[in-house]
């Protein structure tokens, strides 16, 4: 049985391993950079592990195989579940224990909803970017960009409402978020580290995967900062601000 599985496996280059066996469903194969359509040629330093020319059904099935999109997909799918779980926890425990107002519930709900939309749109694009229809791929890419915009909106809604409510003491938290975002963007545009290790980081450790993980870290940091500022605001109101109302 073990020998049969090895015979039916697709062999990939995984780091220093030249022939690493990967089982893929029937109808799915992994391509090299030279074999994929132009629309998928974004990073020449990722040389192998591409999915391409798949119908929707097989795109979904490819969620459970090892490809160069696996980390990109699962990092944001798990990110979605993280923010979904945080939403339930915030609404049932964190906000009530802080004697949060109706406005707090609304702001935190908007923030976490935006983060979840961002994660799901990203998952959708990276899952269906291998679709045989280039038009479908471009639609999912547009949704991915829209999701990024919605995620940024979630940051600004809570930021405007809380961060500078009374003073600028919370500015360092905002700065940290932007530093993480900048770091993620630098990995994205520089294509480091795979630029220095072509073909060695096709499946794990590429710049886009680091970008995805840092995006989750950034949004999680912003959520934690929002909760922190909300709790601080309720425990230590701003008398100077209130006196001028």
Predicted feature locations:
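Multi-pass alpha-helical transmembrane bundles in non-GPCR membrane proteins
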Residues: 1-245
């Amino acid at each position: 049985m073990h020998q049969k599985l090895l015979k039916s496996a697709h062999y990939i280059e995984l780091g220093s391993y030249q022939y690493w066996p990967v089982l893929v469903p029937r109808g799915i194969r992994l391509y090299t950079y030279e074999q994929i359509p132009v629309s998928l040629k974004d990073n020449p330093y990722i040389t192998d592990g591409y999915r391409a020319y798949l119908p929707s059904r097989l795109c979904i099935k490819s969620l459970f195989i090892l490809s160069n999109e696996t980390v990109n997909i699962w990092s944001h799918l798990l990110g979605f579940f993280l923010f979904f779980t945080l939403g339930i926890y915030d609404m049932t425990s964190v906000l009530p224990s802080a004697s949060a107002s109706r406005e707090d519930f609304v702001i935190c709900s908007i923030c976490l909803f935006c983060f979840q939309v961002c994660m799901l749109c990203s998952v959708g694009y990276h899952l269906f970017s291998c679709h045989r229809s280039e038009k479908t791929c471009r639609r999912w890419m547009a949704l991915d960009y829209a999701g990024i915009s919605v995620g940024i909106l979630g940051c600004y809604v809570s930021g405007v409402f809380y961060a500078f409510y009374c003073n600028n003491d919370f500015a360092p938290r905002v700065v940290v978020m932007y530093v993480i975002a900048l770091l993620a963007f630098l990995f994205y545009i520089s294509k480091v580290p795979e630029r220095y290790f072509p073909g060695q980081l096709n499946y794990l450790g590429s710049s886009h995967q680091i970008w995805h993980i840092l995006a989750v870290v950034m949004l999680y940091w912003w959520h934690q900062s929002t909760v922190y500022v909300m709790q601080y605001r309720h425990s230590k109101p701003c008398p100077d601000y209130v006196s001028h109302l």
